[in-house]
């Protein structure tokens, strides 16, 4: 399934998902530091493995995917399948609604 087939995302629900499943390793605010994972500010339109000051796995750099709704929707289903060798230990979000909500929140909070 692709992002175009996903249900509409809810920013507030996405924020809750981010706080419970992502915020222990990621920040979204401009100028916020990296944690276990990179700061996600400016994520949309950026190539994987290119955030300044973060040490990525070779897998993330070599994937060279441009992050957007479609690529994030697929990645967040199963990160280790999408980028074998990624350092991200998160197992993914199986529910299309949760992925759509998280993407809506990320789009709103990282631009």
UniProtKB/Swiss-Prot annotation:
Principal localisation: mitochondrion
GO molecular function: electron transfer activity; heme binding; metal ion binding
Post-translational modification: Binds 1 heme c group covalently per subunit.
PTM annotation (N6,N6,N6-trimethyllysine): residues: 80, 94
Compartment(s) where it occurs, according to its Swiss-Prot or TrEMBL record: Mitochondrion intermembrane space
One Pfam family from the record: Cytochrom_C
Alphabetical UniProt keywords: Acetylation, Electron transport, Heme, Iron, Metal-binding, Methylation, Mitochondrion, Respiratory chain, Transport
Modified residues (N-acetylalanine): 1
Sequence positions that bind heme c: 22, 25-26, 88
GO cellular component terms, A-Z: mitochondrial intermembrane space
UniProt xrefs under InterPro entries: Cyt_c-like_dom (IPR009056), Cyt_c-like_dom_sf (IPR036909), Cyt_c_1A/1B (IPR002327)
Coiled coil segments of this chain: none
Record-annotated membrane-spanning stretches: none
Keyword Heme: yes
Similarity annotation: Belongs to the cytochrome c family.
Note: The authors placed the amides at positions 10, 24, and 97 by homology with other cytochromes c. There is one amide at position 108 or 111.
PANTHER family, sorted: CYTOCHROME C
Role of this protein: Electron carrier protein. The oxidized form of the cytochrome c heme group can accept an electron from the heme group of the cytochrome c1 subunit of cytochrome reductase. Cytochrome c then transfers this electron to the cytochrome oxidase complex, the final protein carrier in the mitochondrial electron-transport chain.
Protein name as it appears in the record: Cytochrome c
Organism: Fagopyrum esculentum
